[in-house]
A protein has these predicted regions:
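Hydrophobic faces of well-ordered beta-strands that scaffold small-molecule active sites
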Residues: 4-8, 35-37, 78-82, 106-108, ...
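C-terminal regulatory/interaction regions
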Residues: 253-257, 262-271
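Extended substrate/RNA-proximal surfaces in nucleic-acid metabolism proteins
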Residues: 51, 55-194
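Short acidic/histidine-rich active-site segments
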Residues: 40, 161, 224-241, 260-261
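An N-terminally biased module of ancient metal coordination in phosphate/nucleic-acid-related enzymes
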Residues: 1-91, 97-100, 165-169, 173-179, ...
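Glycine/small-residue-rich hydrophobic helix-like segments
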Residues: 186-233
């Protein structure tokens, strides 16, 4: 079994705490052969809805990865990626990416509700009073994901498709699903597949995977092949969490292989 964690956050992310070297050592200690660092790159200022200043400062990321390479050597394969927030202004996003390092892998993720309809609220802070409001948030989120899936920019996979469920169910006490949105999810998958993009299975640090079995089967039935696995770890304790179990889930859903990436090109591994 080839073990690779393709969604991790180091101290370069505002919500990360550990060095890349510490994260890589944790992965190595848990029997992993590969880790990809996917620190947040957000075209808006963290915790706000205002656009970040330009040019974007890539030097902290470059230095951190170089230090990890120097410390870890060839003990474990390390890839440099980012989690790019799919935000309101694609033009600004393209400017943010100017001067970026050469990435191996890019996750495209939506973390916020629309600025026009929902005030640009981060999903983490979304506190609907009832299911009607919660579903309004889900619809808004899926509309943003739909738009992003039609973007022809440079990214590898769509991150944690069913992310609102992490917050609505795990934090707010709802018991919601995406079952009412099959048409919307299918459209998103078709857009990704047509453009040669994939999805991730976000193990959600051992909680319900994002997305779950129903949607993984739909993606596979539509012809989707490109798929990665990542823990979304923001600390060393969660590195690699539930990756083994989610590999088994992929096999159950009919997948025979999964991807890692090098210089934005998928490398296939048998499940």
């Amino acid at each position: 079994m080839y073990l690779a964690d393709y969604h991790t956050h180091s101290r370069i992310s505002p919500d990360g705490k550990f060095t890349m070297a510490q994260m890589a050592q944790a992965a190595l200690d848990k029997g992993f052969q590969e880790i990809c660092f996917t620190d947040h790159v957000e075209p808006i200022n963290w915790g706000e809805t205002t656009l970040c200043p330009l040019p974007y400062n890539w030097e902290p990321l470059r230095r951190e990865f170089a230090a990890a390479q120097a410390e870890m050597g060839d003990q474990i394969t390390m890839r440099l990626g980012i989690e790019l927030d799919a935000m309101f202004d694609i033009g600004h996003t393209m400017q943010v990416l100017q001067g970026a390092p050469e990435f191996d892998f890019v996750i495209g993720s939506v973390h916020m509700l629309s600025r026009e309809k929902m005030g640009g609220l981060d999903l983490y802070f979304f506190q609907p009073e009832n299911e009607e409001q919660a579903h309004a948030g889900i619809r808004d989120y899926l509309d943003q994901v739909r738009q992003f899936a039609q973007w022809d920019g440079s990214y590898s996979v769509l991150g944690h498709l069913t992310l609102p469920l992490r917050y609505l169910n795990e934090l707010r006490g709802f018991h919601l699903t995406f079952d009412d949105y099959e048409k919307e999810v299918e459209e998103i998958f078709r857009s990704l597949i047509e453009r040669g993009r994939g999805i991730e299975v976000n193990t959600n640090r051992g909680n319900d995977p994002l997305p779950g079995e129903k949607w993984l089967r739909m993606y596979r039935d539509l012809g989707g092949e490109i798929i990665t696995l990542g823990s979304d770890a923001h600390n060393t304790a969660n590195i690699g969490c539930a990756i083994r179990q989610r590999q088994e889930l992929l096999k159950k859903c009919g997948f025979e292989k999964f991807c890692t990436f090098e210089k934005m090109v998928p490398i296939w591994h048998k499940l």
